[in-house]
Amino acid sequence: MTTPELKSLLHVRNLKMSYGGIQALRGVDLDVAHGELIALIGSNGAGKTTLLKVLAGLLQPASGTVHYRGTPLIHHAAHQLVQEGLTLVPEGRGIFARLTVKENLQMGSYCRSDEPSIDRDMQNVYELFPRLFERHKQLAGTLSGGEQQMLALGRALMSRPTLLMLDEPSMGLAPMMVTKIFETIQEISARGVSILLVEQNAKLALEVAQRGYVLENGLITSSDSAAKLLVSPAVRQAYMGS
């Protein structure tokens, strides 16, 4: 019999995390299947970014279990998780402003030694984001916000992720650039990369996802197909203003 943690690519159960005496996560259960695009929505301060940081190995939980590809992940370092195929694009992008676009992309492959494949992957990133190729010698800090988000995504892809976690990819971007970024997210998903998407624009996130979770006050309060969450009166009132 296949156990739940082996069936899912990512299997999270009863995950708890505290900052001092404040409980940020109060027993989160979440699953991501192979090839799924999952939306995680919730209000500011709900615990979404904390959850992603725990999953990425940047924070240690108080208790609970995380299985990735059937293997327990608690106490793994962040660089080990990147090597295993779990990559986070953080809120605020986290690019290296004083490095060039190309150097930023090369940093994404720091855990790899397969030079020919790295070169091919960089060409694939340039095909996905032609603007990055046009600016590959330019310092990353001089790029526009949208171009920096492209670079953050491209750098993450250079690690060859199996699960890509995105924290607020539309934040601070113009509407046209948001459309471009989300089209690219869908294209990455279509290539077979599993995606866990945290996004302030709940409607947009659910429109591109297969399933969704609602996180409030450190707890998952609802989970369903994205289509059903999109028409849920409670979800629409709380997160879409209608």
Feature map (PLM): residue ranges:
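Helix-to-loop junction immediately C-terminal to a conserved catalytic motif
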Residues: A56
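ABC ATPase C-loop
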Residues: A156-L157
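ABC-type ATPase nucleotide-binding domains, specifically the catalytic core motifs of the NBD
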Residues: G20, I38, H76, V101-R120, ...
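Conserved ABC transporter NBD signature motif
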Residues: G64-P72, E84, S117-M122
